[in-house]
């Protein structure tokens, strides 16, 4: 059936805000990290960027992609949360952030994913990569294919943990925001990334989230921290309030405190300054047709469901313009 496109004009009471948000310039907000970005989830609008396409070693923020592949396999039915994963000698040998898997130790996919999301467990990331693809190398090849599918031009992975900087493992704040947006599109992951404290092994091993925003930032939904001496302090922070969700990525911060403060400043700006306006509230009338096979055709919505508009103190309005018959 032939479709007619409906065009929307968004109006405030006194001024007409742009349907797409106007990004902040560097200097409009104080961000100490050398690279950062603020993106809105539903529209993908970028509200702030600072050296957002600079290639940087991301440390454990790498695991945003690792978790994305795991969650996609769970939701496609390739994996089940109660599947058993057996730790190899290689997985058990990994240090850094870990839960001290022993060779041959068995753990469910559910617990493995929890450990990756909450404490950034390198050993669990390796165990899951081997369980899914046979070897970490094959899993990493899949990570890079997925990055290409997402259009990430400044990303290349050589491992699934982000523990080692070999000069060929890099991403950018923008690319992290895009893959984070894809990940939080799967509500399942928030069952893990919003955990503050939990335990595994029947309560014998306690877990405490490396992302402290989960505890003290209202609406925080995740997502992933990272640190090495070369990557410094990195973070992809996500938060949702009143139906609007933002992704704040901070790369190469000089401390946990400054990293968290930068993310908080970006998220606060987003929540204070913008809102989502739904564009598909009204039922569309049929359009009369002259000299056609039928007397009318159905008019269907085309384009996005929401527009991100500045908060002006007034309720956003939209005007629906139908095409000529």
Please provide the spans of the model-predicted regions.
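Positively charged n-region of N-terminal signal peptides that target proteins for export
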Residues: 1-9
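Basic side chains
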Residues: 2-3, 41, 50, 63, ...
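A generic structural signal for short, solvent-exposed coil/turn residues
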Residues: 5, 13, 28-30, 77-79, ...
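Domain-terminus/edge residues, biased toward the C-terminal soluble/receptor-binding domains
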Residues: 152-156, 164-325
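Active-site-adjacent loops and short helices of periplasmic peptidoglycan-processing enzymes
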Residues: 21-174, 178, 183-185
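Hydrophobic core
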Residues: 9, 13-17
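Residues in and immediately flanking transmembrane alpha helices
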Residues: 15-16, 76, 278-281
């Amino acid at each position: 059936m032939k479709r007619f496109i409906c065009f929307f004009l968004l109006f405030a009471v006194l001024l007409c805000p742009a349907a797409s948000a106007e990004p902040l310039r560097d200097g409009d907000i104080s961000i100490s990290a050398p690279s950062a970005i603020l993106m809105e989830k539903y529209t993908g609008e970028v509200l702030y960027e600072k050296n957002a396409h600079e290639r940087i070693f991301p440390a454990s923020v790498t695991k945003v992609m690792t978790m994305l592949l795991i969650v996609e396999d769970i939701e496609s039915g390739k994996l089940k949360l109660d599947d058993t994963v057996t730790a190899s000698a290689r997985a058990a040998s990994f240090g850094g952030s870990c839960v001290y898997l022993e060779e041959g130790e068995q753990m469910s996919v559910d617990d493995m994913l929890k450990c990756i999301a909450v404490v950034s467990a390198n050993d669990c990331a390796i165990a899951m990569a081997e369980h899914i693809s046979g070897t970490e190398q094959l899993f990493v090849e899949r990570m890079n294919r997925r990055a290409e599918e997402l259009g990430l031009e400044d990303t290349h992975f050589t491992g699934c943990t982000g523990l080692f900087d070999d000069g060929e493992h890099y991403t950018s704040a923008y690319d992290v925001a895009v893959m984070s947006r894809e990940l939080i599109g799967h509500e399942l992951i928030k069952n893990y990334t919003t955990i503050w404290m939990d335990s595994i092994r029947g309560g014998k091993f306690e877990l405490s989230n490396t992302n402290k925003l989960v505890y003290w930032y209202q609406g925080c939904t995740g997502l992933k921290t990272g640190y090495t001496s070369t990557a410094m302090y990195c973070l992809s922070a996500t938060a949702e309030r009143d139906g609007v969700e933002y992704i704040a990525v901070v790369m190469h911060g000089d401390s946990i405190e400054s990293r968290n403060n930068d993310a908080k400043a970006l998220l606060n700006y987003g929540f204070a300054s913008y809102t989502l306006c739904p564009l598909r509230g009204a039922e569309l009338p049929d359009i009369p047709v002259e000299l056609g096979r039928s007397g009318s055709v159905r008019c269907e919505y085309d384009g996005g469901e929401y527009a991100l508009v500045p908060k002006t103190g007034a309720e956003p309005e939209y005007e629906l313009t139908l095409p000529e018959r």
